[in-house]
A protein has these predicted regions:
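Conserved catalytic loops of ABC-family nucleotide-binding domains
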Residues: 127-141, 165, 390-404
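Walker B catalytic motif
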Residues: 109-112, 119, 372-375, 382
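Hydrophobic anchor residue at the start of the ABC signature
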Residues: 96, 124, 359, 387
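Conserved ABC ATPase signature
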Residues: 82-86, 345-349, 353
């Protein structure tokens, strides 16, 4: 082709295609205005000053549109807050709102679901569609939560290539076709296979009952009650309570088996992270129960690396035994593809690379119980499944215990053996306080069913890839499932396919 070309040549080259209209628009008399919601929102705190309400009104004075966005994103409770003290989920919703209120020709949203819970993710998708579609503007979204991408998109472009080397963008496909092509790892229009294996989402089926006696409970120091009492093949924790100025958290007593993963699900700000911190001794419960007797490895939600050296130096310095263990290399290190960034400085890593290193560090630390807070954050679709497999394989093979906080519903269903559901109600005596209650660990289907019922959202499973899909609000399928009380349908993978799933999972 031509090595150089002017705007007229470009338009002529794409004559007769959909791109001709786009380039006519792009190279028109008026330069198009583009607004972007960035991937990394942490820097917003240092750039934007003032309360949420003040900042949004300064960006755009259109109060009618602003009120619609406030309602859809549930921003009422944070309008008086200063931007620099917002939590991750609050900051994400503010950044989305700040993008939506602006007048532009092209809107771009880079990972708008990060730090949002399932309900907020669905509302975010509704908000983008309801606010921008009537304007007939270009809207581009980069998103790694497949269920939200499915709910939000009209068309999908698949990106594939070699990270840090090159990338290829496919032609647009309809939403379902695009997602299926990406999961298959094959672009039929280009006759190109970019992944050797298809991505399958399989339910984390409950493992066989552990056999044998429970053994003896090991007493803590001085006979005092501990957060965790060790039983052979089990750990149990008592009733836990923690009160903050705006929330009161009550966790029902529970029990978890070795080689089992319990997912903590619920809306943001209901105490899931506080529960994890109580288990690992970083927060003391109101009842005065002492710190756990177990060794704990904790991967926090927000990762702020301060290490000055390379990734290799960090890993061999922090987890030398794991780095020389062949089983750990096979189960975790190799699948997470860490060797490719060994020579990179930790300070230069991207969000996804930092997350992968943090997961490896957490799993590599010698511990009895592993607590992972949002391990999917900043990971792409394929990396999320790889991380879920690595976590699952490590916990099963090492016979450890694991709690995971995760808002990506697909990743949650892949990881979970049991589910703890967090629900919150406004305090009748004090309206500014929320009473949060967490259930004991529930079975997979009943747990997710209770969780989705609290959100008034229904999911079904794709017959082919088995990935969970959100039903459109008030659709026929949505109404039928709610009427039957089945908010999470697994009928598509009942007995015939269940045996296939069990036989196809290799640990």
């Amino acid at each position: 082709g031509l090595e150089t070309g002017d705007k007229k040549t470009v338009i002529k080259h794409y004559r007769g295609t959909e791109l001709q209209n786009y380039f006519n628009f792009l190279y028109g008399k008026h330069e198009p205005r583009i607004v972007i919601k960035p991937q990394y929102i942490e820097s917003v705190r240092s750039v934007v000053k003032g309360t949420v309400e003040k900042c949004l009104k300064e960006i755009n004075g259109s109060l009618d549109q602003l009120q619609t966005i406030i309602n859809l994103l549930s921003l009422d409770e944070i309008m008086g807050k200063s931007v620099d003290i917002l939590s991750g989920g609050e900051l994400q919703r503010f950044a989305i709102a700040a993008t939506l209120v602006q007048e532009a020709d092209i809107y771009m949203f880079d990972e708008p679901s990060s730090f949002l819970d399932v309900k907020q993710r669905v509302n975010m998708a509704k908000c983008i569609r309801e606010v921008l579609l009537p304007k007939e503007r270009y809207v581009i979204v980069v998103e790694h939560d497949i269920s939200i991408l499915d709910y939000l998109s009209d068309y999908i472009c698949c990106l594939y290539g070699q990270p840090g080397v090159y990338g290829i963008v496919s032609a647009p496909f309809t939403c379902g076709e695009g997602i299926n092509n990406y999961l298959d790892g094959f672009i039929p229009t280009d006759n190109t296979r970019f992944r050797s294996e298809a991505i399958d989402y399989k339910i984390a089926l409950c493992k066989d009952e552990f056999k044998g006696s429970l053994g003896k409970i090991e007493e803590g120091m001085d006979g005092d009650e501990k957060v965790v009492d060790i039983i052979r093949d089990y750990i149990s924790y008592p009733l836990l309570r923690k009160t903050y100025p705006t929330i009161s958290i009550t966790v029902e007593p529970g029990q978890i088996r070795s080689s089992e993963i319990v997912c903590l699900v619920g809306k943001n700000a209901l105490g899931k992270t506080s529960f994890i911190k109580m288990l690992c001794g970083k927060v003391e419960p109101d009842s005065g129960i002492k710190v756990p007797v177990l060794n704990v490895s904790y991967k926090p939600q927000i990762i702020e690396p301060t290490y000055k050296g390379t990734v290799e130096q960090l890993l061999y310095g922090k987890i030398p035994d794991a780095m020389s263990n062949s089983q750990f290399k096979s189960d975790v290190l190799k699948p997470m593809n860490i060797s490719h960034i060994f020579d990179n400085l930790v300070s230069t890593l991207s969000g996804g690379e930092i997350q992968r290193v943090a997961i490896v560090l957490a799993l590599g630390k010698p511990a009895d119980i592993y607590l992972l807070d949002e391990p999917s954050c900043y990971l792409d679709v394929e990396q999320r499944l790889v991380a879920a497999r690595a976590i699952k394989r490590f916990i099963v093979n090492s016979h450890k215990y694991c709690f995971v906080v995760e808002h990506d519903f697909i990743m949650s269903t892949y990881l979970a053996d049991k589910v703890v559901v967090f629900e919150g109600l406004e305090d009748e005596k004090e309206s500014s306080r929320v009473n949060s209650r967490a259930t004991s660990p529930m079975e997979f289907v009943s747990g997710f069913n209770a969780f989705l019922k609290s959100l008034d959202i229904t999911f079904r499973r794709s017959k082919f890839s088995m990935r969970p899909r959100i039903n459109k609000q008030d659709s026929l399928r949505d109404r039928e499932q709610k009427r039957e009380g089945k908010y999470f349908i697994t009928d598509d993978i009942s007995e015939p396919i269940k045996s296939f799933v069990e036989n196809s999972i290799e640990w």
